Amino acid sequence: MIGYNDFISYSDLANVAKYYKKIINPIQSGKNDALILYTSGSSGNPKSVLLTNENVLASGIYIKNTINLPQTKGDKCLCFVPFKYPYGFATSVLLTMMCGRTVVLVPDGLNKENVKTILPKINYYYGSPALLDVLKNIVSNDVDLSLSHTFVTGGDFFTEKTEKMGREFFANHNCNNITFCNGAGNAETVATWSSSVGTVVRPNTVGRILVGEEPLVVNSETMQEVKYNEEGTLLIRGKNVFKGYYGSPELTKHEKVNINGKEYYNTRTVGKLSEDRFFSLTGRESRFYILNDGNKVYCEKVQNFISLLDIVESCVVVDKPDDCTRYTGKAYVVLKDGILPDENTRNYIFEQCTKKLYNTNNEIIQLNSFEVPTSIDFVDKIALTEADKIDYKKYEKMAEEENENDKKNKRRIKIK
């Protein structure tokens, strides 16, 4: 078998030649199927995304043209995301190699022993913010991370708090110049459509829309284009947009839209696009609920607001069924060390949700009265999926079960 030794011999090449019974013709092969990636299913059922050779190559070219990486040999990138997810295989591995970097894989995971030999050589880190928690728990004080310079996240967002925690961690390991980069993407765009790497890192954005892609932000109800810096749903057009969902032509048709004679992929991502192509992600279409008065609540917006509070480490917001308003907001909150999970703390969070806050850009952030959650539970940590994304389905199920229990308790009270 080829690949079990460090070197490939001429005999190995001969075996490869014998395996192919006909000439490999690269001409017109761009539309050929290349691989199938699976969405993480963090907020729904996983989908099988069929990508062509052209999709993968175009994505690599778009990234290289966007991030302007210098021709540096020897840079090593740590991939910490499972291969079955797009961010793990397509972005962290294939696109990294297309950019001329070396990929370091850890199929058996990181532990207190192997990090001593692996991490000192790493320059780039690919993973969700959950990777920081892993590193904090297993990296001893004597491990030198001075060669580290970039941490690229996908799946979940680096908040101001997680970035601050990350800087403190790397500073304790001789690295004071680490850059944290938020990015965003879908499996349908080979796992990425924006990047902060190699460009100016603008707070509260996921970086620039890749050069080569054609973005369009629209009103999700009318599908009419909105102005720059107005909130809407992001559509993407480009050669990196997937061929379709494997075996699901109707689903493919549903996710691709035609506007002015051009076909776009609907990312279902809500945010604002600036004139210089920076995108501020404010939510996802799949993560909202509509009240009986017609008001729409985006869970990400509420979640990000609560995460800014001085006593909150992190939080998750989901919809909870309600007989009167259809839904209410349910927040699961991880408190900072030393903060008591009592009623006073709960009331403090409710009170802050009615006030104005300022983000790092000194912009005012405020919730509407109908966006304020009606109940808060304190948890020790946020549950994650295998892809290191927040397990929204788990929290949605918990909220549904709580609603059912509330109904049962009300019935018991009436019987008494």
Briefly describe each language-model feature range:
Residues M1-G30, F151, E401-E404:
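ANL superfamily adenylate-forming
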Residues N25-P26, A34-I61:
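Conserved AMP-binding A3 loop
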Residues D33, T39-S42, L50, C77, ...:
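Conserved S/T- and glycine-rich ATP-binding loop of Class I adenylate-forming
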Residues L57-K76, K84-Y126, N137-V139:
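Conserved AMP-binding/adenylation subdomain of ANL enzymes
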Residues I122-G127, K136-P203, E214:
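Gly/Ser/Thr-rich phosphate-binding loop
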Residues R208-G212, Q224-E255, N295-V297:
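Conserved ATP/PPi-binding loop(s) of AMP-dependent carboxylate-activating enzymes
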Residues G238, K243-G244, H254, E263, ...:
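AMP-binding/adenylate-forming catalytic core of the ANL superfamily
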Residues Y289, V316-D322, K330-Y332, F350, ...:
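Conserved C-terminal "lid"/linker of ANL adenylate-forming enzymes
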